[in-house]
UniProtKB/Swiss-Prot annotation:
SUPFAM superfamilies: beta-beta-alpha zinc fingers, RNA-binding domain, RBD. Residues 322-360 are annotated as: Disordered. Coiled coil: none annotated. Residues 408-485 form the RRM domain. Residues 322-344 have a biased composition (Basic and acidic residues). May regulate the turnover of mRNAs in the nucleus. Zn(2+) 1 binds at residues 6, 9, 21, 25. InterPro entries: LYAR (IPR039999), Matrin/U1-like-C_Znf_C2H2 (IPR003604), Nucleotide-bd_a/b_plait_sf (IPR012677), RBD_domain_sf (IPR035979), RRM_dom (IPR000504), Znf_C2H2_LYAR (IPR014898), Znf_C2H2_sf (IPR036236), Znf_C2H2_type (IPR013087). This is UBP1-associated proteins 1C. Zn(2+) 2 binds at residues 32, 35, 47, 50. It comes from Arabidopsis thaliana (Mouse-ear cress). Pfam families: RRM_1, zf-LYAR, zf-met. It is found in: Nucleus. One of its GO terms (cellular component) is nucleus.
């Protein structure tokens, strides 16, 4: 079988594998491993001369010395004769091909072949002298993997080639074409790096030479403009881009140059003035010398006098300028001090005037007489108009309002009988600091009556609590009002009713117990009639709510309890203990809505219903 090597990827191939390899690789030439001849894609199929040698020896060494599969440091076929099975190194003959190859790959033959290779290497070194490694310019190793993909799909971006597997891609990377392109790529990169370094060095050198403040003449806020170039911009970014331009930089350089020249001139002038002021006598001597030289040269005396006068005048002017320059700073400081003193004097005068005005005060009795003539509404309007924020009048009004307990004390009603002072305090602490908190208790039962008082430390807390008078407290609706405020007169008139003559004889058909006529005031029941009334009310399944807890029998209807608490039959009077108003409807079977609602709401606890009306 003939063996070929691909010129592009360097892979060793048998003849039947050539068509498949051609479809995968872009190689156009193949070399025979035995004879070393080059063939194209078509002529390869007609090469059949090396069939016997390839079948005998397998893939042999190419003419340029590269092996196909294994690369040995020495030639194991050294000193072998192909005609006979004989080894000249070991001086041994073999009878067949198998013995021949077994001897060639043996240890003894390999050791002798290594010795021969070492001898040849020493001869080459003796013929060619050693070269210093330091003088050599070592070429950098090429990175063959440049342009190769790490994952599927396998391709080479440098050569623009696709591969079916990773092995074929690596074989392509070892080929000549890929190596040439990698060398070109490395050379281009080195050129780019060198040019970049040169440009960076030039830029740094230019920056070191000239350091210009680009922000000179730029506005810090809207409107955006450049005073040096007399240019306007729509935004800050456009202004900064203008500052980086060439024209603006040139104008900034000119501005800096003019400033430096002015500074140099001022320094030179100062030096000249100091020298002229200190060395005035020397200048006079120079003038005398000039005059004598002029006389020697034949100038007229009048001309000489003019020169002397001009020199004296200039010298005097320079001396005066130097003195003014020295004393200018002192004069400015003195003028500032004088201005400050004048301002202080004016302030003192104003204070004296205000003191004199304050000394003139009216008598308090006169003010009282004036205020008596005003009504309450007029006084309120006058104070409201004259008072201003931060004034003493407002502060005095607020302090007096905070001291007044009536402005800070709140009356709370509607909570349960089991509420304590701690519960009430925690419910109202969110509005402000509390000074006192009390719950009104019943002396007989020792339970709360359902109302209490909360006193805040400041008026602000009370105001915040009264913004919403109705609040939810422990699943109950609580009503808040100022303690000084009382219910309206209409309610009082209804509450202050005359005693009612209660007669329960009409209920004899329903109960055997008969109550004698007794006059009862509002909210009072005689202890003697407690047992008799309880017997009459037990038939309806409910005790009187005033006496505390009630008992319900199975199948009880709350409507009957509501009727028993107010009026059961036509003509019966109202007891006046379950509501604030009196009943006048003698012919109706149902009580008014307010009494019906109270009885139905507090059916389980009559005493609590009494306090929650």
């Amino acid at each position: 079988m003939v063996w070929f090597q691909c010129d592009d990827c360097g892979e060793n191939l048998k003849k039947p594998r050539l068509p498949r390899h051609m479809s995968m690789c872009t190689a156009t030439k193949f070399s025979c491993i035995d004879c070393g001849n080059m063939f194209g894609q078509v002529s390869v199929h007609y090469h059949n001369q090396c069939i016997t040698e390839a079948e005998k020896y397998g893939p042999m060494v190419r003419s340029n010395g590269e092996s196909s599969k294994q690369k040995h440091d020495f030639d194991i076929n050294a000193e072998l004769f192909n005609s006979q099975w004989f080894c000249s190194l070991c001086n041994a003959t073999m009878t067949c091909e198998q013995d021949y190859f077994a001897h060639v790959y043996g240890k003894k033959h390999q050791e002798k072949a290594n010795e021969v290779a070492d001898m040849d290497y020493s001869k080459q070194q003796s013929e060619h002298p050693a070269v210093d490694k330091n003088n050599l310019t070592q070429q950098p190793d090429l990175d063959i993997y440049v342009g190769l993909s790490n994952d599927y799909p396998w391709f080479c971006s440098l050569c623009d080639i696709n591969a079916t597997s990773e092995q074929t891609l690596l074989a392509h990377a070892n080929g000549k074409k890929h190596r040439v392109k990698v060398e070109r790529f490395d050379a281009e990169q080195q050129k780019r790096q060198s040019t970049q370094h040169s440009t960076v060095d030039k830029k740094d050198y230019s920056k070191q030479q000239i350091e210009v403040d680009i922000n000179v003449g730029l506005s810090n806020c809207y409107p955006w403009f450049c005073s040096l170039c007399n240019v306007k911009a729509t935004c800050q970014q456009n202004l900064l881009s203008h500052a980086n331009g060439r024209k603006h930089r040139e104008n900034v350089e000119l501005f800096d140059a003019t400033q430096q020249q002015q500074l140099e001139k001022t320094t030179v002038d100062k030096k000249d003035t100091t020298v002229n002021a200190s060395d005035g006598n020397s200048e006079q001597k120079k003038v005398d010398l000039l005059v004598s030289s002029g006389v020697a040269n034949g100038y007229s005396q009048a001309h000489k006098k003019r020169k002397l006068e001009t020199c004296d005048e200039t010298w005097k002017r320079e001396v005066v300028q130097a003195e003014e320059a020295k004393g200018g700073g002192e004069q400015k400081s003195e003028s500032k001090k004088a201005k400050k003193q004048d301002k202080e004097k004016k302030r003192k005068k104003d204070k004296k005037q205000t003191k004199s005005d304050s000394d003139f005060e009216h008598d308090k009795e006169d003010i009282k007489q004036l205020l008596v003539a005003y009504s309450k509404e007029e006084l309120v309007n006058l104070i409201y108009k004259t008072a201003e924020k931060g004034s003493r009048l407002i502060s005095a009004i607020l302090e007096s309002a905070d001291r007044d307990i009536a402005q800070r004390n709140i009356f709370v009603r509607g909570f349960g009988w089991d509420t304590t002072q701690e519960n009430l305090k925690t419910a109202f602490e969110s509005y402000g600091e509390i000074e006192e908190c009390s719950v009104v208790m019943d002396k007989d039962t020792g339970r709360g009556k359902g109302y209490g008082f909360v006193m805040f430390k400041t008026r602000k807390g009370a105001r915040e609590a009264l913004k919403r008078p109705e609040k939810r407290m422990y699943n109950r609706i609580v009503v808040c009002n100022l303690a000084s405020e009382k219910p309206g007169k209409a309610g009082k008139e209804q509450d202050m009713a005359e005693p009612v003559n209660i007669d329960l004889t009409k209920m004899a058909n329903q109960s055997e117990a008969v109550l004698p006529g007794i006059e009862l005031g509002r909210g009072h029941v005689l202890e003697k009639m407690h047992h008799q009334q309880q017997q009459t009310m037990d038939m309806f399944g409910q005790n009187m709510p005033f006496y505390g807890y009630s008992h319900q029998f199975p199948g009880f209807d709350p409507m009957y309890g509501a009727l028993s608490g107010n009026q059961m039959l036509a003509g019966l009077p109202n007891y006046g203990m379950f509501g604030s108003g009196m009943m006048t409807n003698q012919g109706s079977m149902l009580p008014p809505p307010n009494h019906l609602g109270m009885a139905g709401q507090y059916f389980g606890d009559g005493e609590q219903a009494w306090h929650q009306r």
